[in-house]
Amino acid sequence: MRFRLTFAALPLLSGLFLGHPAVAAEKPLEGITLVLDPGHAVKNDAGKIINAGAYGRGGTQERDIALKVAETIAPLLEAQGAKVIMTRTRDNPWRYGYSASADNRGRAILANLVRADAYIRIHCDWNRDKRFKGHTTFFYRWGSRPLAEAVHDALVRALPGHRDNGIKRRSFVSVSAQMPAILVELGVLSNRVEGKELAQESHESHLAMAVAEGVVEYFKKSKT
């Protein structure tokens, strides 16, 4: 996916990924390995979908949005020196397993095997209450809380006027991951307004910039 510069993303770009050449040359993520996990999109060996993810009005699929956002985040982090590994890609958009829970464990195990410094899961939310909206960041192990705070704070700054559902501790983030791990719900597909936003490439790029900014800020602080 080709990243498109939008006016909404300019403040983040100028404050982090551009700026003075000497600052950009520092590459704060040098030596850092990150696993990005765009959620869902699992089939069994027979080719049947067993984890489709949420959907919005007009057929918008969570799995597609998560993948596009993650593939926009990846080069931003690589530009800062990180090695980025994706659990699925545009060329290989589907994963295969016998259950959704087993596949989720497999994604975390991948992060363990590559000795990732952070495991970042990208999702969109869904709720029976169509009025429910906003972004939420989840963590499980307490050592993951600083990463959750950094990414969530960046999203709050990037999304003025959007509902902030806060940072929450939930075991579904990953009990298997042995490094800081978070799950980011970028917005709510079942909400009419946010569902439309999440389907817009400009908004997806804006979200990607915010997540990337939060990750960079986390590692900058962890090195001090």
Enumerate the language-model features and the residues they cover:
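Bacterial N-terminal signal peptides that target proteins for export
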Residues: M1-A8
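Active-site-adjacent mobile loop/cap segments within catalytic or ligand-binding domains
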Residues: V114, R121-D129, G166-T224
